[in-house]
UniProtKB/Swiss-Prot annotation:
Role description: Probable electron transfer protein for hydrogenase 4.
GO annotation, cellular component aspect: membrane
Lineage: Bacteria, Pseudomonadati, Pseudomonadota, Gammaproteobacteria, Enterobacterales
A biological process from GO: aerobic respiration
An example molecular function term from Gene Ontology annotations: metal ion binding
Residue span, 4Fe-4S ferredoxin-type domain: 31-60, 66-95
Pfam families: Fer4_7
Name of the protein described by the UniProt record: Hydrogenase-4 component H
Binding positions for [4Fe-4S] cluster 1 per the UniProt entry: 40, 43, 46, 50
UniProt gene name: hyfH
Residues binding [4Fe-4S] cluster 2, per UniProt: 75, 78, 81, 85
Alphabetized InterPro entries for the sequence: 4Fe4S_Fe-S-bd (IPR017896), 4Fe4S_Fe_S_CS (IPR017900), NADH_quinone_OxRdtase_chainI (IPR010226)
Lineage: superkingdom: Bacteria
């Protein structure tokens, strides 16, 4: 018995003082995903990549908004959302203490405004996504005077662009046909 007591005294404390002392986690620990709405462009890549369907994106045309929502009750902390985010708006934290008394506290939401088409006035994409695309194109072309033109092109929905292209193609085909006669 004394031998066992000596061994225990030499070994020291085997347990940690958690929750009274903070528990250290390893650097690669995958905890609660944290969204930075200021960086998010509401592209939906994270929702497509989430295998547990914990992330959802809902578009409301009536309110002209897109809502990003994370339900921590479904999250498996795989880190796919962090990997696919093009703007690094989602970061996995070291936070693992997710006990709540209210189920609503397990939800994280962010709302983003949608851009309306300059021709048909229907909402079609988040304003931040279009602004980022126009900015990236302007940087590649190194032409600040084209920014307004790029923004004008980016603020037209795909359906209106397609309609305009088809109309122009038909007109061009008719003009070529008349010239051949």
């Amino acid at each position: 018995m004394l031998k066992l007591l000596k061994t225990i005294m030499r070994a020291g404390t085997a347990t940690v003082k958690y929750p009274f002392a903070p528990l250290e986690v390893s650097p690669g620990f995958r905890g609660k995903p944290d969204l930075m709405p200021s960086q998010c462009i509401a592209c939906g890549a994270c929702a497509c990549a989430c295998p547990a369907n914990a992330l959802t994106i809902q578009t409301d045309d009536q309110q002209n908004s897109r809502t990003w929502q994370l339900y921590l009750g479904r999250c498996i902390y795989c880190g796919r959302c962090e990997e696919v985010c093009p703007t690094r708006a989602i970061q996995l934290t070291n936070n693992f203490e997710l006990t709540v008394t209210n189920k609503a506290d397990l939800y994280t939401r962010a709302t983003f405004h949608l851009q309306r088409c300059s021709r048909c006035e229907r909402p079609f994409a988040p304003q931040k996504t279009i602004a980022l695309a126009a900015e990236l194109l302007a940087q590649q072309q190194n032409a600040p005077q084209n920014r307004e033109m790029l923004w004008a092109q980016a603020s037209v929905c795909p359906e209106c662009k397609q309609r305009a292209t088809l109309i122009n193609d038909d007109t061009d085909v008719l003009l070529v046909a008349k010239e051949q006669l």
